[in-house]
Design a protein with these regions (language model features):
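Sec-dependent signal peptide recognition
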Residues: 2-8
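Serine-dependent carboxylesterase/thioesterase catalytic core
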Residues: 48, 96-206, 270
Length: 326
């Protein structure tokens, strides 16, 4: 299946002109601002998850990871950036990549602080940033964050270890990571890939190690609320709890398959991350009728018929921060 996806991406990207990027930041741009509803004091900086990207393809023919979310924020007054990290690597390495781009945003905008938003494995990146540069962070929102790891990653790592297939898995997935880089108009070696490091970092066991060093916003109780404020930072989380949401969404099949494993061992989940694992700081809502990809409006915004629009939810969060002076 991964090979088919890789070949499809190769076919798509063969029509694009690959251009060198001097910055790995993608700033939200708009030709007109319709309101100041989402005009936060500090810029919003997004961190993608495992297998993530900024944009596959070009502006005119491509797909953003945060589909339609950043442009909407810009139209409503926000200064927002999407960062780029290695699709597959450890939480610490990705965290360093993220922090370097946060420093770039601070330099570009002259802002004193930043509002961070991380999805999936990106939750580790934003939490890493709170640990290494807390005075520069105003708020954190984790979205479907693997804050306690995922049983899916744990089981994949156990399978790799027991069958001795770890190196083969690493080679195949790293090759797919290179395809993702190419699809963004980048050299495949622009960011280092280490699928086994990524698997360990997102496993329950690996995340427990990470949490010993970066425990801000986490609860001592299973599935509990963390501190809402810590060191002057406002801490929030949201997540979905429905693996399959729309028959027209081709990703739902994968979410349903993964749910069979996650639900058996971890209960309610979004197809990859359990509701309990997604807990961080103040839970805004943990029952959005979304799956793991709906949370970022991926697959061109296809979602459940009556599900809230993720674009609106991110805009509302920006307004929440604005009202707090953040």
């Amino acid at each position: 299946m991964k090979l088919n996806i890789a070949l499809m991406l190769l076919a798509i990207t063969s029509t694009f002109n690959v251009q060198a990027n001097t910055s790995h930041l993608q700033q939200a741009d708009t030709k007109f601002v319709i309101s100041s509803y989402a005009k936060t004091q500090y810029p919003l900086v997004f961190a993608h998850g495992l297998l993530g990207f900024n944009r596959l393809g070009t502006e005119n023919l491509g797909m953003d990871y945060w589909y339609q979310i950043l442009p909407d924020l810009a139209r409503n007054g926000s200064t927002a950036f999407a960062t780029r990290m290695s699709p597959f690597n450890s939480s610490e390495l990705r965290g360093e990549q993220y922090v370097a781009q946060l420093q770039e945003v601070l330099a570009i905008t002259g802002a004193k602080k930043l509002n961070l938003i991380g999805h999936s494995h990106g939750a580790h990146a934003v939490r890493y940033a709170t640990g290494v540069m807390p005075k520069k962070i105003a708020s954190v929102l984790t979205v479907g964050g693997a804050n306690q790891g995922t049983v899916v990653a744990s089981d994949v790592m156990k399978l790799a270890n027991t069958t001795g297939s770890g190196e083969l898995i690493n080679v195949l997935i790293n090759a797919f990571g290179n395809v993702l880089m190419w699809a963004q108009g980048l050299d495949g070696q622009a960011f280092p890939h280490n699928a086994l490091a990524a698997g360990h970092s997102t496993s329950i066991e690996g995340t427990a190690e990470f949490n010993q060093r970066f425990n801000m916003g986490l609860s001592l109780k299973k599935c509990g609320e963390g501190k809402y404020q810590d060191q002057g930072m406002a801490l929030y989380s949201i997540t979905g709890n429905q693996p399959a949401t729309n028959a027209l969404d081709i990703s739902d099949m994968a979410m349903k398959a993964l749910n069979r494993l996650s639900a058996y061992k971890e209960g309610a989940n979004d197809g990859i991350v359990s509701v309990c694992s997604a807990k961080f700081g103040k839970t805004i809502r943990d029952d959005f009728p979304w799956n793991h990809l709906d949370e970022i409006n991926l697959m061109f915004g296809i979602k459940g018929t009556f599900a809230p629009d993720p674009v609106n939810v991110y805009r509302q969060h920006a307004n929440r921060l604005k009202l707090q002076g953040l």
